[in-house]
């Protein structure tokens, strides 16, 4: 299980819970929590209760390069996606995982409404009390219809835009 992203809102607290859960299941994980600088860490520690138990070493202060991110995704079977609590749509990480054909664990309960959703590929986790069944990790990735992969690709998106405009 891998997570790469900016440490905002309740992400740090949720990552800590998921880390303990994954460790108890004997699974490998890689979490890269990014903050723009160490001053922001102290601001969050003061203002955000989710950061109260955080330490400077829990975060990275240099963004992961795109080629490093791609390497993390390539080496991972499952990616953790934690949307901002006020976000209702899909994250870019979700779209990336469709293209990468990777399993996704997400806090976005609306994802069930999308045509690419399949329970073997996507598990919705409760951000307050995360539970991820062992079976989800053991299931193979289920290939979805090629039309769906195309729809969420850059080419598919451009076709949709230009077809609508013409």
Model-derived features with residue positions:
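Nucleotide-sugar donor-binding catalytic core of glycosyltransferases
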Residues: 1-87, 91, 106-111, 117, ...
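Short, loop-centered acidic/histidine patches that primarily coordinate divalent metals
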Residues: 95, 109, 128
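A charged, aromatic-enriched C-terminal amphipathic alpha-helix characteristic of glycosyltransferases
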Residues: 129-166
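Conserved donor-binding/catalytic loop of nucleotide-activated donor transferases
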Residues: 74-76, 96-102
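Solvent-exposed, flexible loop/coil residues
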Residues: 94-96, 121
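Conserved acidic donor-binding segment of nucleotide-sugar-dependent glycosyltransferases
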Residues: 122-129
């Amino acid at each position: 299980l891998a997570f790469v992203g900016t440490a905002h809102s309740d992400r740090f607290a949720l990552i800590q819970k998921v880390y303990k859960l994954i460790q108890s299941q004997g699974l490998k994980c890689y979490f890269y929590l990014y903050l723009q600088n160490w001053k922001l860490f102290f601001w969050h520690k003061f203002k955000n209760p989710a950061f109260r138990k955080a330490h400077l070493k829990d975060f990275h202060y240099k963004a992961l390069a795109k080629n490093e991110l791609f390497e993390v995704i390539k080496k991972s079977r499952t990616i953790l996606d934690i949307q901002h609590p006020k976000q209702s749509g899909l994250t870019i990480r979700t779209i990336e995982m469709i293209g990468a054909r990777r399993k996704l664990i997400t806090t976005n309960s609306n994802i069930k409404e999308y045509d690419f959703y399949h329970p073997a590929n996507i598990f919705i986790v409760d951000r307050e009390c995360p539970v991820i069944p062992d079976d989800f990790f053991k299931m193979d990735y289920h290939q979805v219809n090629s039309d769906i992969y195309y729809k969420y690709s850059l080419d598919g998106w451009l076709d949709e835009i230009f077809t609508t405009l013409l």
